[in-house]
C-alpha cells in the first residue's frame, strides 16, 4: 500500500525477507495485478497491456535462474527472446549479451552443465538480448563471488550508459552503495525510506527498523569522524590547560 514514482535513476529495493520486494517488482512487470490502485508505464496503465507486450518494455530476471532457463543450449536460450526479430538479428543480440556477461565461450554448452553463478549470468543475458527499456534484477549477486559481483556491477554500468532503467532487489548493502543512485527501503509492504544511497544509509533508525546492515564504507567513515571528533576535543582541552 504505497505510492511511488520510478525515474531513469538506477534503483535498489532493499528490506528484510517478507518486506514485499518481490511482490513489488512482479507488479511492475505485470506478473501480478494490484488489488487496488494503478501502475502506469509512461502514461499507459499496465492493466491494459498483456504480459507479452509488457515484456518488450520491462525485462525481469528471476532470483532463481532455473525458473527461467528451459533450453538445452546456452545460445538458443539467449536467442529465444529476440527470435521475432529474425534469426540473424537474434543471434547477434544473443552473442552480444553473452559477451557482456562473460559467457561468449559457452554458447554450445547445456546450461545445466554450468554452475549456478553461470546460470544466473545466462538468465541476465537472456533479458539483455531482448533489449527492454527497464531491467529488473531479483537478487543478482546471490551465488556470485567477487569476480561475478564485479561483472554484474559492470553490466549495470553498461546498461545505464545505454539509457536503460535498472531496478534491483538486493541484500548486499555494500554493492548497493557502490552501484545504485537511489535506494528504496521496504518494511511490511510499505516504503520506509527512499532517496540517494548515501543519505538513506546514514539513517540509523531506518536501518535498525528494517534490519539492514550499514555499508562498510559508511560505517568506517562515521567511525573515523567519531574518532576525529574525540581527538579534536582532547586537543582543545590540552590547549586550554
State what each model feature region is.
Residues 110-114, 118:
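Conserved ABC ATPase signature
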Residues 37-45, 54:
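Conserved ABC transporter NBD signature motif
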Residues 89-106:
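Conserved ABC ATPase "signature" region
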Residues 135-138:
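Catalytic Walker B motif of ABC-type/P-loop ATPase nucleotide-binding domains
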Residues 170-171:
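H-loop/switch region of ABC-family ATPase nucleotide-binding domains
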Residues 188-189:
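Conserved ABC ATPase "signature" C-loop
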Residues 29:
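Helix-to-loop junction immediately C-terminal to a conserved catalytic motif
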